[in-house]
Each structure stands twice: as structure tokens, then as C-alpha cells.
Design a protein with these regions (language model features):
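Short acidic helix/loop segment immediately C-terminal to the autophosphorylated histidine
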Residues: 10-17
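Conserved glycine-rich
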Residues: 184-185
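Short helix-loop "hinge" at the ATP-lid/N-box region of the Bergerat-fold HATPase_c
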Residues: 111-112
Length: 217
């Protein structure tokens, strides 16, 4: 309700009431952050407290990641990022489409947030004898390696604070971690200050598609 009122008040002509418009804009941004925080808290609570649904599908990874790349290009238009996608069109993984969508989009959105102008973001998917892997790499701010073990904790903020510099709920990587756990997978983080970061999702061989099944994507 509050968000609706604020959006209505924002229709006031800025030239007429500049100070009011500025204050309402700030209030609207705060309401959006609160809305995002509540959404992420509810999602994380569900991931932590419920068992994975037995109904799983063969998710079309290329289609999902290509859509996210297009969204990222739109979001980062003013930063002129180079966003590369290296994903085989036949790539599929058995899982929960909505959960995987949340995990992958969190990683790509983070890369957009923490990569400076004209930076490069690389999204790559590959398979080997160990399973399937998705990496999202950037040449952005980077993180001091001593913080890496705690990055998937709720609300954890490194000293150089990628989060405080760019906003965010502080729950994104916790969500990624729990989605991967529900898919028998894991998250690997490599980073160095000033050199960027690489976040890699690892899925075991049993998550690869080996026979016909329902497809989502």
C-alpha cells in the first residue's frame, strides 16, 4: 500500500516541488529495497526449511542464461559492459526451473553490479566427467580472499563492501548456496581485490540429462 501511494505522489511535477519529489524518490527507493529484502528472506526461509520437490525437469540452460544475458545488457546499458555467453545450445540439467533461475540470476546480477564501466562479464557452461558447471566471471572490484569462506552467510558484508557500495539485500549468495545444495551441488568462489571474481556452480553427474524427460526453460 505504501509503495502505491509513493508511486502516485511521484507524479508531482519535479519543477513544481523539487524538494518533495527528491524526498519521495528516496522513500520509494527504500520501499523497493524493503520489498526485495522481504522477498529474499521468504525465499531463503523456504529453501532452508523444506525438502526439495521430487518433481524435477530437464531445464534448458542455454535459453535461461541467454534471457538473463539480455536482461543484464539492458540493466547495464549505461556501463557499456561486454557480456559474453559460452553455453552449448543443447545444455540441460535436471532440477527445479524457478530455483535455478533464482540462483543463476543472482550471480549474473551481482556481476553487473560490481563490474565497472566497460568491464567484461563471462558466462560459461561446460560438462566433464565430474558433472556440469556454470561460471560467472567478472573483472570488477574483487573480494579479499579472507572473506570468501563467509560470503554465503546471511547479511555478511566484506570490509571493502561490494554490498554497501551498490545496495542489495545481502542474501543473494546465501540463496545461491541453498539452491545448489538442493540440487546436490556446490558453489566455488575465486576472487582477488582489483582483479575480479569468478563464481562457479558445480552439479554432479546425476543431474545431467541422460534420457528423455519433461523439459522446462
Amino acid at each position: 500500500m505504501l509503495k502505491g501511494y509513493l508511486e502516485t505522489l511521484l507524479d508531482v511535477t519535479p519543477e513544481e516541488q523539487t524538494r518533495l519529489h527528491r524526498a519521495l524518490s528516496q522513500m520509494n527507493q527504500q520501499s523497493l529495497r524493503m520489498e526485495a529484502l522481504v522477498h529474499d528472506l521468504l525465499l531463503l526461509s523456504r529453501l532452508e526449511s523444506t525438502q526439495a520437490d521430487d518433481v524435477q525437469q530437464a531445464v534448458l540452460v542455454h535459453g535461461m542464461l541467454n534471457r538473463m544475458r539480455e536482461d543484464a545488457i539492458s540493466i547495464s546499458a549505461d556501463k557499456h559492459h561486454q557480456i559474453e555467453l559460452d553455453v552449448p545450445k543443447e545444455a540441460r540439467v535436471i532440477g527445479h526451473p524457478a530455483e535455478l533461475d533464482s540462483a543463476f540470476s543472482n550471480l549474473i546480477t551481482n556481476a553487473v553490479k560490481y563490474t565497472p564501466e566497460n568491464g567484461v562479464i563471462k558466462i560459461r557452461w561446460w560438462q566433464d566427467e565430474k558433472g556440469a558447471h556454470l561460471s560467472v566471471a567478472d573483472n570488477g572490484l574483487g573480494i579479499d580472499p579472507r572473506h570468501i569462506p563467509r560470503l554465503t552467510e546471511r547479511f555478511y558484508r566484506p570490509d571493502n563492501s561490494r554490498v554497501t557500495q551498490t545496495g542489495g539485500t545481502g542474501l543473494g549468495l546465501a540463496i545461491v548456496k541453498h539452491v545448489l545444495l538442493r540440487h546436490n551441488g556446490s558453489l566455488e568462489i575465486q576472487s582477488a581485490l582489483g582483479k575480479g571474481s569468478t563464481f562457479t556452480c558445480h552439479f554432479p553427474p546425476e543431474r545431467l540429462v541422460s534420457k528423455p524427460t519433461a523439459v522446462a526453460g
